[in-house]
Amino acid sequence: PVVPLAMSDHPASVTFRTIGGEGDRPVSYSYGYANTGFVSAGERVYDSAYFKRIPAYLKKMAGGTDSISKLVEADKTLYVQGEVKDKPFTFNGIPMPTPFDKEQPAAQQFTPHAKKNYLVETVIADTWVMNVYEVSATGERKTIGVPKKDAGAN
């Protein structure tokens, strides 16, 4: 479940999640504004169904989490990106490029509004896709992110 953080009048709440990939493909999320560059959102984010199944001592050793929530500034374009950790194909211990190498999910941008909740979710499947949703109080999702433009201005 998306757990919104308590908000004052100004910030918006963003939750980062991963679906699929089991334990092999956690996603490292980062976010930032046009003039600040990206900062890490925190630990690697694993698929929540997978994360619930692994024993606590392994979680402590390996680190990671099944979701991260952050408060972000409202009415400023926010950029989000996720980097999927992939296991390279090796031949006799030598990493080899393969035609199956996946593209990292495209970075997204959106403008959060005060007191709203947003979900940044990467789905690990045949392709890796990251989407941004605005989540209503009733849990309905509306897709709002667009691929990040090179220009920082809207």
Residue ranges and their predicted role:
Residues 1-154:
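Short loop/turn and low-complexity linker motifs enriched in small/turn-promoting residues
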